[in-house]
Amino acid sequence: MITPLDAHGNIDYNATNILIKYLEGINVDYLFPMGSTGVFPYFTLKERKDFLKFVRENSKKPIMAGVGSSSINEVNELMKFSMDIGIEAAVLMPPYYIKLNQEAIYHYYKEILSSNDMDLLIYNIPQFTNKIDPETVKNLKSEFSSVKGVKDSSADIRGFMEMLSLSDDDFAVFQGQDDLLFTSLELGASGGVCGTTNFSDGIVRLYHEYKNNREMALKIEKNDVIPLMKKLGKYQFPNAYYEYFYKKNNINGGYRPPMYRVGIEI
């Protein structure tokens, strides 16, 4: 989910409700607030909690809460809060800013998992954070039953295939790059956690068609998903995602610096 903003850069809860109803209408399986597209680092802990609470109170869909932070104390606080309000799972990427080796990343997750019983999806997005290797994921998976899967947004298909080798009935592997979802499903991925669902149902249609009509799914990727991703990719992430949502819904939305309007045509 994006985090809709008003003209002053504050969270717009009316627009958020529009987004929730849209996502429910296209039949996504989960809502994922406060992730990368939701620009979670731009918000205070209180803002993040308030947004998570609003989403929980206004949707009966299962929710995966973004709890990312380099501060373990902040992660623990967000996970406890999320559990207390009835959110089903958390999504957590490795720490960012300071370069860490795999041992440090393992201990980061171990500290958090030892303090929380909440189901967790590990989030590999090395464009923005430290990279977590499949072997580290494997070690955490074997030690903690609450590790239920991984979202991989690395765009590294070989690395993704290594993640896929970990999948089983209790461990799901999701693709985070919209234009790689079809290929990932071919390789055995559980599904996708994809940003264009904020304003387009292409990914959802692709996923459901794939089960019954592979050729139709491939056509959706070629005609809908890839052109949209190429258009969005011309602009600073994730500004165009916000503007696309605002324009599609006739919302006078805003941006929180360093975000800005990019002028995308829809």
Swiss-Prot record:
Pathway the protein takes part in: Carbohydrate acid metabolism; 2-dehydro-3-deoxy-D-gluconate degradation; D-glyceraldehyde 3-phosphate and pyruvate from 2-dehydro-3-deoxy-D-gluconate: step 2/2
In this record, what's one Pfam family?
DHDPS
Protein EC: 4.1.2.14, 4.1.2.51, 4.1.2.-, 4.1.2.21
Can you tell me where the transmembrane regions are? none
What pH behaviour does activity show?
Answer: Optimum pH is 5.5, and 50% of activity is found at pH 4.5 and 7.5.
What processes in GO biological process is this protein linked to?
A: glucose catabolic process
Catalytic site residues? 151
Q: List residue numbers at the site (Proton shuttle).
A: 123
Q: What CDD domains has UniProt attached to this entry?
A: DHDPS-like
Broadest EC class assigned to this enzyme: lyase
* Sites where the protein binds substrate: 36-37, 123-125, 151-153
Keywords in alphabetical order, please: Carbohydrate metabolism, Lyase, Schiff base
Q: How does activity depend on temperature?
A: Optimum temperature is 65 degrees Celsius. It shows high thermostability. At 70 degrees Celsius, the enzyme does not lose activity upon incubation for 2 hours. The half-lives of the enzyme at 80 degrees Celsius and 90 degrees Celsius are 20 minutes and 15 minutes, respectively.
Q: Which reaction does it catalyse?
A: 2-dehydro-3-deoxy-6-phospho-D-gluconate = D-glyceraldehyde 3-phosphate + pyruvate; 2-dehydro-3-deoxy-D-gluconate = D-glyceraldehyde + pyruvate; 2-dehydro-3-deoxy-6-phospho-D-galactonate = D-glyceraldehyde 3-phosphate + pyruvate; 2-dehydro-3-deoxy-D-galactonate = D-glyceraldehyde + pyruvate
Q: Does the keyword Zinc apply?
A: no
Outline the subunit composition: Homotetramer; dimer of dimers.
State the function annotated in the UniProt record: Involved in the degradation of glucose via the Entner-Doudoroff pathway. Catalyzes the reversible cleavage of 2-keto-3-deoxy-6-phosphogluconate (KDPG) and 2-keto-3-deoxygluconate (KDG) forming pyruvate and glyceraldehyde 3-phosphate or glyceraldehyde, respectively. It is also able to catalyze the reversible cleavage of 2-keto-3-deoxy-6-phosphogalactonate (KDPGal) and 2-keto-3-deoxygalactonate (KDGal). It is equally active with both D- and L-glyceraldehyde.
Protein family membership: Belongs to the DapA family. KDPG aldolase subfamily.
Q: What is this protein called?
A: 2-dehydro-3-deoxy-D-gluconate/2-dehydro-3-deoxy-phosphogluconate aldolase
Per the UniProt entry, what species is this protein from, by scientific name?
Picrophilus torridus (strain ATCC 700027 / DSM 9790 / JCM 10055 / NBRC 100828 / KAW 2/3)
